[in-house]
Amino acid sequence: MDPYKYRPASSYNSPFFTTNSGAPVWNNNSSMTVGPRGPILLEDYHLVEKLANFDRERIPERVVHARGASAKGFFEVTHDISNLTCADFLRAPGVQTPVIVRFSTVIHERGSPETLRDPRGFAVKFYTREGNFDLVGNNFPVFFIRDGMKFPDMVHALKPNPKSHIQENWRILDFFSHHPESLNMFTFLFDDIGIPQDYRHMDGSGVNTYMLINKAGKAHYVKFHWKPTCGVKSLLEEDAIRVGGTNHSHATQDLYDSIAAGNYPEWKLFIQIIDPADEDKFDFDPLDVTKTWPEDILPLQPVGRMVLNKNIDNFFAENEQLAFCPAIIVPGIHYSDDKLLQTRVFSYADTQRHRLGPNYLQLPVNAPKCAHHNNHHEGFMNFMHRDEEVNYFPSRYDQVRHAEKYPTPPAVCSGKRERCIIEKENNFKEPGERYRTFTPERQERFIQRWIDALSDPRITHEIRSIWISYWSQADKSLGQKLASRLNVRPSI
């Protein structure tokens, strides 16, 4: 018998039931009892093992992005950007890289409807020849806050009330009344695009500012954008109620059925670029995640296309155990000093270790598809077969060496240790500009959603006044309409 052939995989299933240790099970229907009506015996190991495994089938759900669906496919470079990055998977047009993508809602639980007004996660794992690259983003190009210090409080405010387990507007609007930088995100969330029709008809964005580095070591700030070839479609409230009332997993089913039918969803990848030498030339901070970069002066540059042409084989193994982290990058791509990105670099890996264990990157869906080597040994659920005698570095008995050095962004850091906000907040200009691009009918729906939210009986006059003041600073007519309908005088 080849001991390596039968490593755990369903392809090696025996024709009969066995225990976890491989012993044959001749009766998988009845417990072992004393006589036909007597007590069950503790020595019924098969029963105990079966129940114990069942009791442990569930793992902690993600604290955010719990509800999601995944699919596999490929990314293909269509345009040469080798002048901007030395990333191997972007080296030339025609290069294809396997990917797995997870779409998700953000705040609500694993079994919640996919028709709730909520941002959508859009996370892509590239299995490159130089290791994995995780581009972990959302469907909106901006975020609520710009500093990760606020992230736990933000999620607590958006999550259900800890006393009643009910999501309530007064908690959300109380928290964000302290954070006017959230206005831009709300012009997306409370807009008509706040409920995507499904995952196929949805934009994607890397949200944070990253850096691209070319072979010469020249670095550029970069933003990543996914555009669906089938267009963006959304649900208005009435449609969401109808669709969600019929099938609370409609987006998951749409993705699965479309791929199964050969109707493969496709997205084009675009980037925006800023030379760090020019970062002070704008009226916003390029590292501020609450801002978009204006496309009229920073145009979208095409890079490639992503096609999802294969459904996952097992939901638990390739969706629940699928783990993303913005820290997972490859040569030619690096982090910027975006405050939210810097905190995500730690937090995502940390939550995966809590949820899946310290060896979560050994799980097949998370493991790199290229050769890899390190001395990270042992720990809970370490199932990698290793026969080395040397588990340290350096050693004259193990010829492993350092990889060839690759360019990283040049950076000179100086300054005082301090906790402070960025200088260019500019919280109101962009939300106002975006609101003014809406048609009158779309503006009216946006206003009505805010009327509904601010009409929560637990929202105080002070909080209503703050929000009307914020929206008045973004657009005077918007603030006036809200104030009139809520019978509140704006105070700027």
From Swiss-Prot:
Amino acids binding heme: 348
EC annotation from Swiss-Prot or TrEMBL: 1.11.1.6
Biological process, per Gene Ontology: cell death; cell redox homeostasis; cellular response to nitrogen starvation; cellular response to phosphate starvation; cellular response to sulfate starvation; hydrogen peroxide catabolic process; photoperiodism; response to cold
Catalytic activity: 2 H2O2 = O2 + 2 H2O
Annotated InterPro entries: Catalase (IPR018028), Catalase_AS (IPR024708), Catalase_clade1/3 (IPR024711), Catalase_core (IPR011614), Catalase_haem_BS (IPR002226), Catalase_immune_responsive (IPR010582), Catalase_sf (IPR020835)
Compartments, as annotated in UniProt: Cytoplasm, Cytosol; Peroxisome matrix
PROSITE patterns: CATALASE_1, CATALASE_2, CATALASE_3
Cofactors required: heme
Molecular functions per Gene Ontology: catalase activity; cobalt ion binding; heme binding
Any one cellular-component term (Gene Ontology): peroxisome
Active site, UniProt feature: 65, 138
Superkingdom field: Eukaryota
Assigned keywords, A-Z: Cytoplasm, Heme, Hydrogen peroxide, Iron, Metal-binding, Oxidoreductase, Peroxidase, Peroxisome
Pfam family, one: Catalase
PANTHER family: CATALASE, CATALASE-2
Described purpose of this protein according to its UniProt entry: Catalyzes the degradation of hydrogen peroxide (H(2)O(2)) generated by peroxisomal oxidases to water and oxygen, thereby protecting cells from the toxic effects of hydrogen peroxide.
SUBUNIT field: Homotetramer and heterotetramer. At least six or seven isozymes are produced from a mixture of 3 gene products. Interacts with NCA1. Interacts with LSD1.
Family: Belongs to the catalase family.
The name this protein goes by in its record: Catalase-2
Lineage start: Eukaryota, Viridiplantae, Streptophyta, Embryophyta, Tracheophyta
Gene name as annotated: CAT2
